[in-house]
Amino acid sequence: MNKKELYNKILQLDGLTNEERSELLGLLRKQKKYGLVWEDKPEDVEERLRDELPVLIEDATKAIISDYTDAPNHVLIEGDNLEALAALTYTHEGKIDVIYIDPPYNTGNKDFVYNDSFVDSEDTYRHSKWLSFMNKRLRIAKQLLSDKGVIFISIDDNEQAQLKLLCDEIFSQNNFVSDVIWQHSIQPKGYV
């Protein structure tokens, strides 16, 4: 039975309310999609961005100085990453060749400046808050990258799988180059 025949059969079914019939037809119309599903979680910084234009202020004590006259113009930005990325879209869209980010790993560590515990009782899907956090930043990062631009993302095993799927969705899996694995710390003697 093809989709059209199934559609006609649903229309002819007895004992269904119009609402039930509409629901079944709606399910039939939905296209299958592979990908991540998560609940969008708003952040306080998003409210500020709606009301205020983010402004970057130069701190000469943190200037990156080069002895070369033809040196590229490098910028180190310190501050809320979503605000900084949003500010850069006004001046650097499509102009950045390399982005390196070291986002929270969602490990629950309380010693970080940023929230590193994105799973809570309100999180219907275990990784929703973290994925929502990363999605917003990576979509802006994509806007900033030049055609030859690359992004390096430091992450641990806790969110690596989710990050890979999210990056495939945003940047296309065809643009993925490689995972670079490095040993964070030496294991104690006798570790197997």
Give the residues covered by each predicted segment.
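Short, glycine/acidic-enriched loop or turn micro-motifs at the edges of active sites
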Residues: 83, 105, 159
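DnaQ-like (DEDDh/DEDDy) 3′-5′ exonuclease domain used for proofreading
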Residues: 1-100, 108-127, 136
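Generic beta-strand/beta-sheet core signal
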Residues: 99-104, 152-156
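Class I S-adenosyl-L-methionine
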Residues: 177-192
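A short acidic (Asp/Glu
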Residues: 87-88, 162-166, 190-191
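Conserved Class I SAM-dependent methyltransferase catalytic core
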Residues: 127-181
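Hydrophobic alpha-helical scaffolding
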Residues: 75, 153-157, 191
